[in-house]
Amino acid sequence: MNSMKYRDLREFLSLLEERGELKRITQPIDPYLEMTEIADRTLRAEGPALLFENPKGYDMPVLCNLFGTPKRVALGMGQEEVSALRDVGKLLAFLKEPEPPKGFRDLVDKMPKFRQVLNMPTKRLFSAPCQEQIWQGDDVDLRRIPVMQCWPEDAAPLITWGLTVTRGPHKERQNLGIYRQQVLGKNKLIMRWLSHRGGALDFQEWCQENPGQRFPVAVALGADPATILGAVTPVPDTLSEYAFAGLLRGHKTEVVKCLSSDLEVPASAEIVLEGYIEPGEMAAEGPYGDHTGYYNEVDHFPVFTVTHITQRQNAIYHSTYTGRPPDEPAVLGVALNEVFVPILQKQFPEIVDFYLPPEGCSYRLAVVTMKKQYAGHAKRVMMGVWSFLRQFMYTKFVIVCDDDINARDWKDVIWAITTRMDPARDTVLVENTPIDYLDFASPVSGLGSKMGLDATNKWPGETQREWGHPIKKDPQVCARIDEIWDELAIFSDREPRR
């Protein structure tokens, strides 16, 4: 499956530069708003990753737009083409519900998957590049890092690509998650994690088991792309993100123990923040411009106290911005969409395609096409989408169409909605469901409704009327007109259209 081989972020950047996918910017650029403007224009033009080598006021380079095209997301997952991400999804579907070989031929077919599994265990190092430089105690100062302030009304600089490492009590497996972190001071950050996310759940369990005791946390900045992408991919609960990153990368993930706790962080990370969360210590977070295109509400989240900063020599700070799509999370969503399809098809073989339009904030609206087999089938599928993967917990709208509709063509989808739906019969409303905290349209923070649209052809039992059948052209006539089309010269002054 692998074709893009790299060991760490720096090696990945070198490979991108060889392909013309990385631009070094030597002019002084301000992390306050200017980097966002340049990155936004570059992303909208499907441009390269950006390495700002001279941030104003800092001596640490800033990397932006790393995942600014689906192609670079695929490369980060070890694939040359976006279409190959379906293979990543098939591998995840296999790992989620592995099946023993049915015979010798099946064993041969599955050997590549079994071979990849050999890269799953992590490799623990006693020393690592991420600990080449160490600051602790009073020497800790987050202001050395060129953290971007992305939008004019943002409350403060914001760490965006921090890979947060936690472990709940009595758990061997660590959790990796991407949570934004507002800079409060030289050694304080706000950890914005939602209550159902892995890090927040680990913290809740810790507080129950160890009341009043500090909760160890580590944040890796500038981890290798496979590890970052592993943290945002629907990895089975029995598989660690480090193990999955090893599968993507083609060799084992190397980790090292933190200086202040037993947590293990990526050995090649550019920067690592170590510290703790004091139970009960909270702070007001925000407002920040986010992926919806709006500034979000202010809310309270735990404070992360940093006791150690370790980093590589000549460290690179990896950052991004979030705003109205397209932004980097939206591009990431387009690429990960290809990973989701085989996972859903494993559970629901009737699904033909699944699409999360980026303009729907990457996850708030889904279009599903399916081979309908019985009355009520579309409603079963929409309920399945909402419940199967936690990534779709916040999907507000699910549109289900037949397999003659192209899920990725709005003209097709709108035609199906307007010709195959009766609003009262074919609309499903579900109230009091989990909703993204950033969704200010919901009546209560974190709780709102969902809508399912059954835009499939209706079967007996779903309608009492004779159902229409689509107009189709006569293929023989089409072939005849194809033969004489150029002679007709109808569009002689411009490109012919058929």
Swiss-Prot record:
Q: Membrane topology per the record? A: Peripheral membrane protein
UniProt keywords (A-Z) are:
Cell membrane, Decarboxylase, Flavoprotein, FMN, Lyase, Manganese, Membrane, Metal-binding, Ubiquinone biosynthesis
E.C. number, please?
4.1.1.98
Catalytic activity reported: a 4-hydroxy-3-(all-trans-polyprenyl)benzoate + H(+) = a 2-(all-trans-polyprenyl)phenol + CO2
Tell me which cofactor or cofactors this protein depends on.
prenylated FMN; Mn(2+)
Q: Where is it located?
A: Cell membrane
Q: Name one Pfam family in it.
A: UbiD_C
Question: What are the positions of the active site?
Answer: 290 (proton donor)
Q: Copy out the cofactor comment.
A: Binds 1 prenylated FMN per subunit.
Query: Any idea which positions bind Mn(2+)?
Result: 175, 241
**Pathway involvement?**
Cofactor biosynthesis; ubiquinone biosynthesis
Can you name a GO cellular component term? plasma membrane
- Per UniProt, prenylated FMN binds at 178-180, 192-194, 197-198
Q: Which GO terms describe its molecular function?
A: 3-octaprenyl-4-hydroxybenzoate carboxy-lyase activity; metal ion binding
UniProt-listed GO biological process terms: ubiquinone biosynthetic process
* Intrachain disulfide bonds: none
The domain of life for this entry's organism is: Bacteria
Question: What sort of enzyme, by top EC class, is this?
Answer: lyase
Report the sequence similarity comment from the record. Answer: Belongs to the UbiD family.
HAMAP family, from UniProt?
A: UbiD (MF_01636)
Which PANTHER family does this one have?
3-OCTAPRENYL-4-HYDROXYBENZOATE CARBOXY-LYASE-RELATED (PTHR30108), FERULIC ACID DECARBOXYLASE 1 (PTHR30108:SF17)
**Summary of the function given for this chain in its UniProt record:** Catalyzes the decarboxylation of 3-octaprenyl-4-hydroxy benzoate to 2-octaprenylphenol, an intermediate step in ubiquinone biosynthesis.
Assembly and binders: Homohexamer.
Q: What is this protein called?
A: 3-octaprenyl-4-hydroxybenzoate carboxy-lyase
Q: Which gene encodes it?
A: ubiD
